[in-house]
Structures are given as structure tokens and as C-alpha cells.
UniProtKB/Swiss-Prot annotation:
Protein localization: Cell inner membrane
UniProt entry tagged with the keyword Isomerase: no
Catalytic reactions of this protein: a quinone + NADH + 5 H(+)(in) = a quinol + NAD(+) + 4 H(+)(out)
Organism of this sequence: Leptospira biflexa serovar Patoc (strain Patoc 1 / Ames)
Family: Belongs to the complex I subunit 2 family.
The protein's Enzyme Commission number: 7.1.1.-
Lipid bilayer topology: Multi-pass membrane protein
Keyword vocabulary terms for this entry: Cell inner membrane, Cell membrane, Membrane, NAD, Quinone, Translocase, Transmembrane, Transmembrane helix, Transport, Ubiquinone
Record-given protein name: NADH-quinone oxidoreductase subunit N
One Pfam family per UniProt: Proton_antipo_M
Amino acid sequence: MSYTPSSNDLIAISPMLILCGVALLSLVVQFLIPEEDEGKPLWVLSILGILVAMYALYHTTNSPGYGKFFGSQISISPLTVWLSAIYLIAGLITLLVAPPFLSQHKTLFPEFFPLMLFCLSGMMFLTSGYDLIVIFVGLEILSLSLYVMIGMARTSVSALESAMKYFLLGTFSSGFMLLGIAFLYGGSGTTNLDGALRGLSLKGYEANFSKLGLGLFFVGVSFKAALVPFHSWTPDVYEGAQTPITGFMASAGKASALGLVIILFNHIPMGEMGNVWKYLMGTIALISMTWGNIVALKQDNLKRMLAYSSISHAGYIVAGIACGAGLEALYYLFSYSLLNLAAFAIISYLEQGKHEVTVNGISHLSGEHPFTALALSLVFLSFAGFPPLIGFWTKLFLLQKMAESDLFFHRVLLFGAVANSCIAFYYYMKITIQSYMKQETGVVAGARDLPSLPTLGFLIFLLCVFFTAGWIFFQPGSLL
């Protein structure tokens, strides 16, 4: 059956088309620029592409508006628009932070820029897709781009090892997802998201196929979200990849996987089977947040600490989703992505191409580099949920939503989230204590301080965010 796209169909996916078009243009332009430019024209072109895609994304909310497009293959909703905004903001910040670091390591290859744009378009297709095939294709575009970006540091053994490990395990998880799609199609007769999951409410072999299919599909999604027990790749890949790439993975990459979890939960039929899946994912979330925090306590390398911390944060978000959080989980994703980008940007600055940033290595950082110490401490205090920083508001609203339910299991998840927040507070505070209260000078004290003007701008931005956070969430309609 042939299908001719309408103008509204094309406008609905215009942000993705712009990103892909600029990426293809970049592949051509790289052969026309002199080698000594180190990709500066590509850098400018990529930033312009993301800014135009942001405008197109905003325009889609007015014309053609929210709805289904391409014969219900694509869905544009407030949730997908906000998720896409998170990806584009994360990509823009990464493009601003990464080039100096990559140049220092002699790994700023021209292909980095189109790969970033392809990766962003894959993320947007992943969460805007209303068909399991579209979702899978978006996931593969995202994954293949990340595999190559991680492995671009060809002289780094750890980066190549990380890329290979992520590629092999990612391919394995993609196989589970594809097999899950096959079973969902076998149980429902359609790959349309709503119809495929409706097979769970049927009787007989169709329901069994659908249950098995959804389970296999969730295995792949849990791998991308780094939920226990599919998390083993996270610390090694985060540590081995170049720091700006790690920050992008931990922000936009994590947001895309968890955004897909939100979408899937919105489409699982209500009733007994829906409750079973909520109990299952809630249990995985509880184990993830506990395991991530306990192992993070023992880490000295900041990148590995943030890797295990990301496992626990994924647990918080999925626990909230299992308790019915929608807006709250979205806001958590937004703030968590910003904090991750800030944390890895500061770490990349401290590394200076030669240092491995450890907890002991930042001793007395405030005495040598006060602006850097202040920025680093604010970010980690916000991770810990220290009031009134942005991290405090995100956890407060998520925990409030979890506390609204009287179900015993939801109370268990609430208690687990609060207890784990207390555990996490210890190792986040350790960063501030080490940088302000230790007299011995650490290894990274020889690094340059962050420029005062950008640092002050970053702090003002944080202040604006946490002061407006409460207003935003007490008027949820302002978001969706």
C-alpha cells in the first residue's frame, strides 16, 4: 500500500529532517575546508543546524500541532516536544564544550559534528515514533552514532575498549528489542504502539506472545537506561569515553531511554496486567537506586562515581513513573540532564588532557581555583538534593507524587527513594568537603581555573532555574 506524505507530515518531522540535512551537508563540506581549520566551519554549521531545529520544533506545536502523522507512524505530543528540547539543548551545550577538549586530545575529527546531529535525530525519532519499527530505527541511529563517537579516540586504549564493549552489549540488547517487536506483532497483528500493547489485554496465545514481547522489549530499553541488571557497561564506558562524550551520553542518551519508558507506561493497558508491569519495573527501580548508590560510595574516580550515580538516578525516575509520575519525571530528566552536562564539562576542564580526576585529586581545589571549586560543589550539592538548588526541587516533586498513593508497594518505593537519597548525600558531600576542607593540594590543582565570567553566568543560570522551578511545577499546565 502506497502512502503519500502530506505537508503536515513533513512539518511534523521537520526538526529531524533539518538535523539530517545539515549532517549530510557537513559530510560534504568537510572535504572543502582546509585541514588546519580543525572543523570550525563544521562547528558553526552544526550549531546553526541545532538552533534552526529548535525553531522548527517550536513551530510544530502551532502548525501542524499535536497529533499523529505519517499514518500514525509519528506522534507529536507535549511530552515528545519537551523530550526533543532536552536532546537539542544537550547537543548544543556539548558542541560548545567538546571542541577545545577534543582538540587538546587531537581527536577533533570532522566526522564528530555530523555524528552528533545524526545522534540527535535518532533520539527524536526514538521518542516521537508511534510505531515499534520507527522506534527501533531511531534507537539504532542513536546507538551507531554513539559507538563511533566513543571510539574516535583511536590512540586511547580505554576509549576503544569502551566503544567495543558498548557496541557488543548494545547489539545484544538491540537483538532482544527486535525479538520483542516480533512477538508483540505476533500477539497483536500490528507494530503500531497502541495496538501492539493492547495485545496484553487479550486472552490465549496472543496475550502470551504480547507479554513475552514486552518483556524482551523492556530488556533492550533497560540496557539503554542502565537499569540493574543491565547496567554493567555503564562505569567502564563512562570512564573510558572522552569526557564531553560521556556527558552527552549521560544527559541526552539517558533522557531518550527514560523518555521511552514514560511513553511505554502511558500506553500499557490499565488493569491487572498493567499493575504487574508496574510492580516489575518498580522492583527493578528499587534495586537500581540501591545498587548504584552503594557502589558509588566506594568510587574515587569522579567519572565512575557519576556512572553509578546515573544508575541510581534512573532508578528514581522509573520508581516515580511506576507510581504515576509524568510531569515530575519529565522535569527530573530535564534538570538531571543539565546537571550531568555541567558536571562533565567541569571534569573535562580539570583533566586538561593529562589528569584523571579523582576525589583525592581535587583536595584543596578551592584554594587554587575558587571559581572551579564553587561550580563543582554547586553541581554536586544539586545532585544531592540540597535546598534550594534545582536538584532539591526535582526530588521534592517526584517524592510528593510517589507519596500521593496509598498502595503499600508505592510506600516501599517512596521509603527506598528517601533512604537512597540519604546515602547519595554522603558521597556527593564528599566532593565539597574534599575541595574546601582538605589542606593537602590535589593532583588537579595545577589545572587552569574556570574563567570567571562563564562561571558567574553558569551560577546565575542555576539561580534562575531553581527560583522558577517551584512556580513551573505549581502550574503544571505551563509545561504541558
